[in-house]
Amino acid sequence: MVFTDPPYNVAIEGNVSGLGRTRHRDFAMASGEMTREEFMSFLSAALANLAAYSIDGSIHFVCMDWRHMGEMLQAGGANYSELKNLIVWAKDNGGMGAFYRSRHEFIFAFKNGSAPHINSFELGQHGRYRTNVWEYRGVNTLKAGRAEELALHPTVKPVAMIADAIKDVSKRGGIVLDVFGGSGSDPHRCS
């Protein structure tokens, strides 16, 4: 399975990091400098590699900001066999950088290939009731340890959210791939 958080091609510095003590600089690439065509090419190449180097039937969770959901749908459609669902991560606080403060992020659930995929929740049959709205506290929530987490990455994904996604579509001892390591949530959860 894949859980990955590619750059969103959105400026970070002065846009996402706000005015607090922790200020983030733009990423090395895909921080708003790419044209739509360049970003499409970037996403398509990344997704093509994810599909090529993962098993047939695997589920790939790919995070993306609402500003580039069209590009993600197009790149995903070109590289995956199916869009299984569009998941909304509903955070408890809105972020910066938009006309309305965004209190959500999208997670695209794509299927790679035609083999059967793992589904450990099957509409609640295994005691796991899951919907396509995932409610997890964002790191910008006022809590102990928040400053350290925010210092790692401007859009840190909650470890519990990634852990649940891993449980949904993989088995113990399976392989989890994240080619955009970001804040390190995946390796932390898989350990």
Protein language model annotation of sequence segments:
Residues 1-191:
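Core catalytic lobe of class I
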